[in-house]
Amino acid sequence: MPRNEKKTGQSASPRKLRVGELVRHAVAEILSQGGVHDPVLETHLITVPEVRMSPDLKLATVYVMPLGGKDEKPVLAALEQHKRFLRGEVARRVNLKYAPDLRFRIDERFAEAERIEKLLRTPAVQKDLSGEEET
């Protein structure tokens, strides 16, 4: 199930998706331009694949992944440390009534995709995919 769908199967509103994309672009731009002066963040390239907004648009869950998947905990700690600065920068770049509070999470989709790829490359699955039957 995609992250933007509720457990009831309803999809996210277009406004939540649009605001999430605006916040994602703002955070990615701030991080790529070196707007945060932190030794950990300055030495890592960080991707921001998704931002999920709460229904009232006051909370943004920002999914991040350091390039290569290394040093996730120090990067997450540095982002949490500079959360207030990032919130202010997002407020300046995105025109909203309230600046959303930022919550940072590591994006697990890359690890999950790698796990599925490894599973698909196993001999048992390859045998099933090639159409060979065991008798």
UniProtKB/Swiss-Prot annotation:
Subcellular localization: Cytoplasm
- Leader sequence range is none
GO CC, one annotated term: cytosol
Gene Ontology biological process:
maturation of SSU-rRNA
Q: Which SUPFAM superfamilies does this chain map to?
A: Ribosome-binding factor A, RbfA (SSF89919)
Ordered alphabetically, the record's keywords are: Cytoplasm, Ribosome biogenesis
Q: Which InterPro entries match?
A: KH_dom-like_a/b, RbfA, RbfA_dom_sf, Ribosome-bd_factorA_CS
**Per its record, what are the GO molecular function terms?**
ribosomal small subunit binding
Domain of life of the native organism? Bacteria
| Family membership | Belongs to the RbfA family.
This chain's function reads: One of several proteins that assist in the late maturation steps of the functional core of the 30S ribosomal subunit. Associates with free 30S ribosomal subunits (but not with 30S subunits that are part of 70S ribosomes or polysomes). Required for efficient processing of 16S rRNA. May interact with the 5'-terminal helix region of 16S rRNA.
What is the protein's quaternary organization? Monomer. Binds 30S ribosomal subunits, but not 50S ribosomal subunits or 70S ribosomes.
Q: Which HAMAP family match?
A: RbfA (MF_00003)
Looking up NCBIfam families in the UniProt record yields: PRK00521.2-5, rbfA
**What's this protein's name?**
Ribosome-binding factor A
Species source reads Rhodopseudomonas palustris (strain HaA2)
